[in-house]
Regions:
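Cleavable N-terminal export/targeting peptides
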Residues: 1-42
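Short loop/turn motifs that connect adjacent beta-strands in outer-membrane beta-barrel proteins
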Residues: 54-67, 80, 94-107, 133-140, ...
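Transmembrane beta-strands of outer-membrane beta-barrel proteins
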Residues: 68-70, 108-112, 138-144, 235-239, ...
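Hydrophobic, lipid-facing positions within transmembrane beta-strands of outer-membrane proteins
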Residues: 68-70, 84-86, 122-126, 220-224, ...
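C-terminal outer-membrane beta-barrel translocator/porin domains of Gram-negative envelope proteins
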Residues: 299, 306-314, 318-438
Length: 508
């Protein structure tokens, strides 16, 4: 632990010393107020709504010029174990003589991330975001992402994924209903004898189901997007293109050393039995009337190339994108994948969502923001990769929402736990700032965040109802570092599981 703290301190000092900018605050509160008022005399090249102007306290705390932020990332989750990595950000705010200084969190942002997990997962990404590029109404965004996850989660597709976890205990033969995930997973990992040729298994071999809900997933992604603002910056029209190359490797019949010997309880080697992905794929191939893959035209068993044309229409009155305290964000986003977009698949995706932010206490009592999000996603097509069903793509700078479960959706449920053709999601948070300070020229603001997540998947719009909605409460902590970098710690508990996350960025 001391070594980790030492490495963190060295990294922090190096980042701090790289700043050319002096202290954030100019001097007295009166001087700061005078500078903010002077900003009103600067002329924008086009009209911007006053709703888009940053709050006075955000302007006072905003840095000028170029600066860098970043942190080593140490996380632990039940899927990947310990993850070690780093996220680095390079920002340019220009100075207070730039009229856009008072309307945007940054003029340029470069971001880089690299993470390596105990389970072998690797993530690397490069991003660039330039609002009001060349002092115009246009915004440019670019992304390059590589990821490989040997434990990518798959629990099926359709409303049947809403069923509570159940399993047959390999030791007693009893059926366990309403299981919690740790016990469910432990039972999968236990060894068992082969079930015979009817199941494609050798009765003389020792098998396990430890990877039943997992696939070995990899992706290369290149995405480019342009946005243009209308109505004094409130409306944004987005047009983008994305190429995504997906690799899928199944665990069926592979020897794994992650099995647990049913007699000794020790880790041992065994042959992986049929996975959930293969079972669903074969049911679709055989024309099973109950197969979700056959009913919904699901494909992508071996991965493939996905070419996407993306469009989005957004109404945005938030005051500060990375950490809003007021305003709303409304969005309709659409993705089209077809042969003419360079894709091996044929589908369309739609997302409608709204995010709302409102300060609920007087300024004298501190900054407390009530934040909420409501989202509805839909996917249809003649050949839909199963991986796309588990992603609600969004046109905004925040990107899509992996559904349903995990760090950005239902935080108390396993990642990818619920997936359907129609997805509904709601999140409510109370972001209450309780302390802020400046350390080594770095502005830090801390907030406590109780939250509630709710969601459900459906096979079609005609099936929509309010029964069997999945809910989890939770508590979190936020650190806003120089306003534009948000560190998030969340703990959530559900009927199935309890999970902790330490990641960058608000949930929404």
């Amino acid at each position: 632990m001391r070594r980790i703290i030492l490495l963190f301190t060295i990294f922090f000092v190096l980042i701090t010393e790289s700043q050319a900018q002096e202290a954030v605050f100019l001097g007295t509160e009166e001087v700061d107020r005078a500078v903010i008022i002077a900003g009103d005399t600067l002329t924008l090249p086009f009209d911007m709504s006053r709703e888009k102007r940053l709050l006075p306290e955000d302007i006072r705390n905003k840095r000028e010029g170029w600066y860098a932020t970043g942190l080593p990332e140490l996380t632990v989750d039940p899927i990947r174990g310990l993850t070690v990595g780093a996220n680095a950000f390079l920002f340019n705010n220009n100075d207070r003589t730039d009229p856009f200084y008072y309307f945007t969190p940054y003029r340029i942002r470069y971001a880089m991330g690299l993470r390596v997990a105990q389970n072998g997962r690797i993530d690397a990404e490069l991003n660039v975001d330039v609002p009001f590029i060349f002092n115009s109404k246009w915004r440019f965004r670019g992304d390059f992402i590589y990821a490989n996850d040997p434990n990518w989660q798959y629990f099926g597709i359709g409303s049947q994924t809403l069923n509570n976890l159940r399993y047959q205990d390999k030791r007693t033969g009893n059926i366990v209903e309403n299981a919690r995930f740790p016990q469910y997973y432990e039972n999968l990992a236990l060894t068992r004898p082969g079930r015979g040729p009817a199941f494609g298994e050798d009765p003389n071999e020792t098998y396990t189901d430890v990877h039943f809900n997992e696939v070995d997933y990899s992706q290369f992604l290149l995405g480019l997007a342009l946005e243009r603002t209308f109505f004094e910056g409130r409306m944004r029209l987005m047009l983008g293109a994305e190429i995504l190359v997906i690799g899928i490797e199944q665990y069926d019949k592979r020897t794994t050393v992650e099995a647990i010997d049913i007699n000794t309880g020790e880790e041992t080697g065994a042959v992986q039995g049929q996975t959930r992905l293969t079972r669903d794929f074969l049911a679709g191939q055989q024309g099973d009337a109950n197969s979700s893959w056959a009913r919904f035209n699901i494909g992508g068993y071996n991965g493939g190339r996905i070419g996407l044309l993306q469009t989005g229409l957004m109404w945005d009155t938030r005051d500060l994108e990375p950490d809003p305290s007021r305003g709303m964000f409304l969005e309709y986003a659409q993705e089209i994948s077809a042969t003419w977009t360079g894709s091996e698949f044929d589908f369309t995706k739609h997302l409608v969502q709204g995010m709302f932010y409102q300060r609920v206490l007087p300024n004298s009592l501190g900054r407390t923001v009530f934040a909420s999000r409501f989202a509805l996603g839909y996917i249809r097509g003649n050949n839909i990769p199963f991986t796309e069903v588990l992603d609600l793509w969004g046109a905004s700078e925040g990107g899509g929402i992996p559904v349903l479960g995990g760090a950005r959706a239902l935080r108390g449920y396993r990642e990818g736990r619920f997936a359907g053709m129609v997805t509904a999601l709601a999140n409510i948070e109370l972001r209450s700032r309780f302390y802020q300070t400046t350390i080594m020229n770095q502005h830090m603001a801390f907030s406590a965040v109780p939250f509630l997540d709710a969601g459900r998947v459906y096979d079609s719009f005609g099936d929509m109802s309010l029964d069997n909605i999945k809910v989890n409460p939770g508590i979190g902590l936020r650190l806003a570092w120089n306003q534009a970098t948000i560190l998030r710690m969340d703990y959530a508990r559900s009927a199935e599981d309890a999970q902790f996350f330490f990641v960058f960025g608000h949930t929404f």
